[in-house]
């Protein structure tokens, strides 16, 4: 298991996960769009969610983000 605090400013990037990730949003707002499946989800301060180990998709950070993350290896 690896955990920590991650901060990022407004912008966009593509993400590809090879392990599960637990996320708790402390600050900010992000629109997450999976590649080739499902619809976008907007997450913001107070939300907690899990990325599956095969997730691939884009992050559109609309407000600066501070999140807690925990990768399950």
What are these model-predicted stretches?
Residues 44, 53-73:
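Ligand-binding loop in jelly-roll beta-barrel domains
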Residues 9, 33-37, 62:
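Short strand-coil-strand connectors
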Residues 16-45:
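A short beta-strand-loop-beta hairpin characteristic of the jelly-roll/cupin
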Residues 7, 31, 50, 60, ...:
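Conserved beta-strand segments that form the floor/walls of ligand-binding pockets within enzyme
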Residues 1-17, 43, 50-54:
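Conserved short histidine dyad/triad with adjacent acidic residue
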């Amino acid at each position: 298991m690896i955990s920590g605090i991650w901060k990022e400013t407004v912008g966009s990037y593509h993400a590809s996960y090879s392990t599960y990730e637990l996320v708790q949003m402390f600050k900010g707002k992000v629109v997450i769009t999976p590649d080739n499946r499902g619809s976008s989800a907007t997450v913001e301060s107070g939300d907690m969610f899990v990325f599956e180990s095969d997730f691939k998709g884009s992050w559109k950070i609309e407000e600066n983000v501070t999140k807690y993350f925990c990768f399950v290896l």
